[in-house]
Amino acid sequence: MRLDKFLVDCGVGSRSQVKTFLKKKQVTVNGQVETSPKTQIDENQDQIAFQGQSLTHETFVYYLLNKPQGVISATEDARHKTVLDLLDDTARHKQVFPVGRLDIDTHGLLLLTNNGDLAHAMLSPKKHVDKIYQAKVDGIMDQEDILAFEKGIELKDHTCQPSKLEIVSVDRDAGTSLVQITIAEGKFHQVKRMVAACGKEVADLQRLKMGPLSLPNDLELGVWRRLTQEELDALTVFGIPLT
């Protein structure tokens, strides 16, 4: 493997930044300063260090983000803050992207990775990957709504697949409901439109689960972390190489 590719994979910087670091003699291979980006190295045997810090090669990385409201699920945008803006420089240089999208005013679990095959598998309609949302609803949701979800909500442009509506609590004095909704699709504003089709309105929407991944209770809004080994093991169900 070329040294510059190794350094980019490790999140040291972009390819052009890496060339600058090499010129400044900030990279060593087996203890010797190396300045050529074309140098061939063995990522499993050679000891590579940047600014004195030893590096370990990673082809793919996986970050779990508790996305806040007001941030869009994109890699770049001229008007809005993106989920990549919440990462540090090292994580951003891994060239990750969000797996699927959450609306700008929806918060909760979002997976970021640079593994395109895994993202494709998790988003494929053929895989029927369940997403679980918790919604605060203006209006009282009832058994009739549960049956409508089970049957498949009819929207103007789409009949939704059968889904699950669970009523967590109801405040009749305030005229509000707290519900959990499980869907396998990911159409535009789908949960909000499904609730609206029942004559109610989503006031707040949070994603709790996507496939085998769950939003950790201790992960604060706007904070991200690497997936644990247990979470990575759970992703093997998709049959995609993760390393």
Predicted regions and their residues:
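Basic, flexible Lys/Arg- and Gly-enriched helix-loop patches that mediate nucleic-acid binding at interfaces
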Residues: 1-243
